[in-house]
Swiss-Prot record:
Name by which UniProt lists this protein: Serine-rich coiled-coil domain-containing protein 2
Source organism of this protein record: Homo sapiens
Keyword vocabulary terms for this entry: Coiled coil, Cytoplasm, Cytoskeleton, Phosphoprotein
Residue spans of biased composition, Basic and acidic residues class: 426-443, 573-584, 601-611
Known function: Microtubule-binding protein which might play a role in microtubule bundling.
Protein location: Cytoplasm, Cytoskeleton
Length: 834
């Protein structure tokens, strides 16, 4: 198969977007600058992996690309030894990149920043023997990961490359960049040598694990407990050291994350590959293939793929559904997401038939391994589940950061605007892959069962198992979704909720998670499985329906049915499923457990029976609102609540409705009645005004108001009406008076005008006489100008102009011109001013 598998580097996008060079997956800069084949050219591997950037080998492209690509460029950290890691760090511009990655598993001393240098000796790493060293985890951000991813030959298949490391930054905290062995993330298949440091604590795998390029031995350190797994040992023989620490839990998310192998070499995939380097987040979980690590929270590693399935991502965090879809690890040609990430877009082409055969065999192993592993995980994780909830959530959050991409293929995409949301969300399955899937269903029906919605339904009953997180079934996640407030059963998806929101962990990625944990924006679907997404949507719809009902009840049901208050038991049940990890919500338990004692009768105001909504209450949306029983008034409860909780107020309305205090309800009722009474009064007034109805009738129409004051108000209103009538009468009288006065004024004005006219004529007649001028204030000297006028002297006018303000001023000139006694002085008066 290895011979058949051809690793093709596609120059599809020669230039990494946003300055990230497409690293051809095989070459990584050695500390001494020599390119090393990431695939760890295995003796057996016939794979010819060659990196061409624009046809030229780029041995050291990674470091420079990495700097830009990811502030978490863990890339260079894939070093054989810690010293080498430092050297690689030197090459790596970003000190974070320098974080010694435990994935130094390249025999060749690949210093390349690939965290997940899944150097599978092509044969050693059978599809079944996919080994992932968590340290080797690709730092997708650094894109050295893409170079590693660049080529997964089936033999050299990075199939189980630990991409958790790819989801670095947080994983780094874990020591392996986000290499959470998802609760012993994957059981390495019988042949698989996956070194996972499930615990983020084990920052570096033992040099052996880094050196164990052979898939045969990779050290999985969980909480620094190392179990060396012989890749050839059957998975059951593999000893996992479970320390009850986050490491185990980390595996859980990864199971959810299950790297989906992009089987198709589709051009879109390739473009996607070119883009993935763009994802500056090393967090790109390879793949787009990663489901949110939380998807099952518990799908621990029961890798449906199993190492036998050479999932390019060394451990498919394998939601069974994810496994389904991505799941022919390399059916036909598969582009590993990591490969996609590598700008080289190296795709592993594998003979679908060979893969199918191997896959079938591997599946048998996987099934066995998954069962045994699951049982182990169930036992260990039952213990760890609690640990997980207490401590793992933090890790989960780190996983979310770890996979700003892992959790959300989408979040990764958003954090890096460079990535297509849809592509990252979806694994594309070639028909070959589909056929492999079918085989897988045949070979491992129990795993696929989990993928089926029916299994999901079954999973509902398995809440305990879900709590055990060891459950690898996506269905269990879904059951949790509906049944539990813990991690959203679809932790990969919708119910990520606040604990999954940890964008802080993903330095690069802002998780576009809905605060409600409904879904990452962009509707991230589990890779290849849409059933779970449907379940999520169904849950959401159910919650929304409950919301609507409650809203209606609040607004419309003034007559509050006296329902029994929510039982504390129910609240407690909800609490049980709340992740204690969610620090934000931990105080909620207190609220939940509070009896509604302060409500003194609030129970009578429940809008609807709590049971009606209770099945929704267990959904993630209702996960924690402390509001239900908070003694605060319904409106007061909003005041200090976090935004997402405030939203939950609406989501959990049925639960929150209890919050309405008796006083609040009374006020509401009073307000309503007051409004009604006012409206009725207005109506009555209108009737009275029109005379269409009598006060008595109107009073009867009024509802008996709870307030005894209404009767008095009615009488007062009558008095007011009488006063209004009186005022109207007065107004009418005044109007009449006004009209009379206006008439009088008009007549007086006419008379006055006539009088003025008469006076004017009188004045005109007598202005000719000198005595008439004396009253006008003209002194005898005026005669001199008047006499002068006879002499033809017109200069008498200026003194007259001084008096132009008075009519007499014009009259004097007329007088001056009066030499012609027979003439009216009007003409002369006009001449004078002229």
């Amino acid at each position: 198969m290895e011979e058949k598998t051809q690793i093709k580097t596609f120059l599809g996008s020669k230039l990494p977007k946003y300055g990230t060079k497409s690293v051809r997956s095989t070459l990584q800069p050695m500390p001494n600058g020599t390119p090393v084949n990431l695939l760890g050219t295995s003796k057996n591997s016939n794979v010819k992996s060659y990196i061409k950037n624009n046809g030229s080998d780029c041995p050291s492209s990674h470091s420079f690309n990495w700097r830009k690509a990811n502030k978490y460029q863990l890339c260079a950290q894939g070093v054989e030894e810690p010293n080498n890691t430092q050297n690689s760090h030197d090459k790596i511009i970003d000190p974070e990149k320098r974080v010694p990655t435990q994935g130094m598993f390249d025999k060749n001393g690949i210093k390349g920043g690939l965290k997940s240098v899944s150097l599978f000796t092509s044969k050693l790493a059978k599809p079944s023997t996919m080994f992932v060293s968590s340290t080797e985890e690709l730092n997708q951000k650094s894109f050295s990961g893409p170079s590693n991813l660049g080529k997964f030959t089936k033999g050299t298949l990075l199939g189980r490359t630990s991409y958790s490391s790819i989801n670095t930054p947080k994983s780094q905290l874990n020591g392996f960049y986000g290499n959470r062995s998802a609760g012993s993330m994957q059981r390495p298949r019988a042949n698989s040598c996956a070194t996972r440091s499930s615990s983020g604590e084990s920052l570096a795998q033992s040099p052996d694990s880094s050196k164990s390029i052979n898939c045969e031995k990779m050290v999985r350190s969980q909480s620094f407990s190392h179990s060396i797994q012989n890749s050839f040992l059957p998975p059951s023989s593999i000893t996992r050291s479970h320390s009850f620490n986050r490491a185990v839990d980390l595996t859980k998310p990864y199971q959810n994350q299950q790297l989906s192998i992009r089987v198709p070499l589709r051009s879109s995939m390739l473009t996607r590959n070119s883009r993935q380097p763009e994802v500056l987040n090393g967090n790109e979980h390879l793949g787009y293939g990663f489901n949110r690590p939380y998807a099952a929270g518990g799908k621990k590693l029961a890798l449906p793929n199993g190492p036998g399935v050479t999932s390019t991502l060394g451990y498919r965090m394998v939601h069974p559904s994810l496994l389904k879809s991505s799941r022919s690890p390399f059916s036909g040609t598969m582009t590993v997401d990591g490969n996609k990430n590598s700008p080289a877009d190296t795709c592993v082409e594998e003979d679908a038939t060979v893969l199918a055969k191997d896959r079938a065999a591997n599946k048998d192993q996987e099934l066995i391994e998954n069962e045994s592993y699951r049982t182990k995980n169930n036992q260990t994780m039952k213990h760890d589940a609690k640990m997980r909830y207490l401590s793992d959530d933090v890790d989960d959050i780190s996983l979310s950061s770890l996979s700003s991409s892992d959790k959300n293929d989408l979040s990764e995409d958003f954090s890096d605007d460079f990535i297509d949301i849809e592509d990252s969300n979806r694994t594309r399955i070639t028909p070959e892959e589909m056929s492999l899937k079918e085989e897988k269903h045949e070979n491992g029906p129990p795993q696929d069962m989990f993928d089926s919605p029916k299994e999901n339904e079954k999973a509902f009953s398995k809440t305990d198992e879900w709590i055990d997180i060891s459950v690898s079934d996506r269905s269990e996640c879904t059951k949790h979704t509906s049944g539990n407030n813990l991690v959203s059963p679809d932790t990969d998806y919708r119910a990520g909720s606040s604990f999954e929101l940890s964008p802080s962990d993903s330095s690069d990625g802002t998780y576009m998670w809905d605060e409600e944990g409904l879904e990452p924006i962009g509707n991230v679907h589990p890779v290849g499985s849409y059933e779970s997404s449907e379940m999520n949507s169904i849950d959401i719809l159910n919650n929304l329906e409950s919301c609507d009902l409650e809203d209606d009840d609040l607004m419309l049901d003034v007559d509050l049915p006296e329902d029994a208050p929510l039982e504390n038991v129910e609240c407690d049940n909800m609490n049980r499923f709340d992740r204690p990890d969610r620090n934000v919500r931990q105080p909620q338990e207190g609220f939940w457990k509070r009896p509604p004692q302060r409500w003194s009768g609030q129970e009578h105001y429940h809008l609807s029976h709590p049971d009606h909504y209770h099945h929704h209450g267990k959904s993630d949306l209702s996960r924690g609102s402390p509001y239900r029983e908070s003694p605060l008034g319904h409106f007061e409860s909003y005041g200090g609540m976090p935004f997402f909780q405030a939203q939950k107020m609406f989501v959990d309305v049925p639960e929150n409705t209890v919050i309405l205090d008796e006083m609040t309800l009374r006020h509401m009722v009073q307000d309503c009645t007051a409004v009604k009474t006012q409206l009725l009064k207005l109506k009555r007034l209108l009737h009275q005004h029109d005379g269409s109805g009598s006060l008595h009738d109107i009073q009867l129409s009024l509802p008996s108001s709870p307030e005894p004051e209404d009767g008095d108000k009615v009488y007062k209103n009558e008095d007011l009406l009488n006063e209004i009538k009186q005022l109207k009468d007065e107004i009418k009288k005044k109007d009449e008076k006004i009209q009379l006065l206006e008439l009088q004024l008009a007549t007086q004005h006419i008379c006055h005008q006539k009088c003025k006219e008469e006076k004017c004529t009188y004045a005109d007649k007598y202005t000719q006489t000198p005595w008439r001028r004396i009253p006008g204030g003209y002194s005898a000297p005026s005669f001199s100008p008047w006499q002068g006028s006879f002499q033809g002297i017109p200069r008498t006018v200026p003194p007259h102009r001084r008096q132009t303000s008075s009519t007499t001023a014009f009259q004097q000139p007329s007088q001056t011109h009066r030499s012609h006694p027979g003439k009216t002085n009007k003409a002369t008066t006009y001449r004078g001013p002229q």
